[in-house]
Amino acid sequence: MASVLHKLITPLACSSPEPPRNKVTVVGVGQVGMACAVTILLRELADELALVDVVEDKVKGEMMDLQHGSLFLKTPKIVADKDYSVTSNSRIVVVTAGVRQQEGERRLNLDQRNVNIFKHIIPLIVRHSPDCIIIVVSNPVDVLTYVTWKLSGLPMHRVIGSGTNLDSARFRFLMADKLGIHSSSFNGWILGEHGDTSVPVWSGTNVAGVNLQTLNPNIGTDFDEENWKETHKMVVDSAYEVIKLKGYTNWAIGLSVADLTESLMRNMNRIHPVSTMAKGMYGIGDEVYLSLPCVLNSGGVGSVVNMTLTDEEVAQLQGSASTLWDIQKDLRDI
């Protein structure tokens, strides 16, 4: 007797279903991982979403919760497992797994603990999706992006750190808020390390083409009577403040990662400050990943914009690179 399925549907295609073309995997289903997953779903960037986590019940519960909302989404397939075979044929893999940053803990203190985790997960990602682009989100993101590049064997343009894309968004929001305009109308960049030694490019801040340094030559310096420099300090401290208030950060970084995913998936050639290999640029001699203005397309980092910086900004960027190298050179087993 024929089933309801066979009575209802007559198949026409003889071949098996095609593999996904725009599959995204999120590794780690903590607060950050799920914020990334949800924002990617809401922005309709994937035809399949895979979730992976070492805690099997947690990852399957998150999968079911999202599947139950499928009616309200445009992603037809959501899968999850602790086995990395579920990630096969991913175009983009977002890595959020790692030890959570604690209140008052500086990002660079997380290094070796998270390196040991990456030694397990990165080879598995590459085994199942050898052509993928990896976006590293786990902190300390610049160090772990370098570690991912070393462990993966992928070309450097396909290993990207979320970097200062979020720092720059925070900077633009805080500066625009003081000016009474929308953050999209303020143009400003933060480069270097995602965190304590990040570099605000005050020389490039502008609104509608009006460079703020021409209005206030001391902007961002210790001699600035308006104390705009405090805005960058607020950017650096903002994650610690949010962690102090709610225990973790997740929504802003999730939105930031979805923004990067869109530029990559849709071949947009948009420019983002993300963590990339900086050796040979701005006098940086060591193999470090830090944020520079990168053109993102379907191949990963297509190119890097040679931003005009002041001598002081270059020195700060070199200092940021030195800070990261001092950590990296002591890492074990990568």
Swiss-Prot record:
UniProt main location, coarse: cytoplasm
Gene Ontology molecular functions: L-lactate dehydrogenase activity
Tissues showing expression: Eye and liver.
Quaternary structure and partners: Homotetramer.
Protein's cellular compartments: Cytoplasm
Record family assignment: Belongs to the LDH/MDH superfamily. LDH family.
Domain of life: Eukaryota
Keyword list, A-Z: Cytoplasm, NAD, Oxidoreductase
Catalytic site: 194 (proton acceptor)
GO cellular component: cytoplasm
Gene (UniProt): ldhc
Reactions catalysed: (S)-lactate + NAD(+) = pyruvate + NADH + H(+)
Pathway: Fermentation; pyruvate fermentation to lactate; (S)-lactate from pyruvate: step 1/1
Residue numbers binding substrate: 107, 139, 170, 249
Entries under InterPro entries matching the protein: L-lactate/malate_DH, L-lactate_DH, L-lactate_DH_AS, Lactate/malate_DH_C, Lactate/malate_DH_N, Lactate_DH/Glyco_Ohase_4_C, NAD(P)-bd_dom_sf
Protein's recorded name: L-lactate dehydrogenase C chain
Enzyme Commission (EC) number: 1.1.1.27
Top-level EC class: oxidoreductase
Keyword NAD: yes
UniProt-annotated binding residues for NAD(+): 30-58, 100, 139
GO biological process terms held by the UniProt record: lactate metabolic process
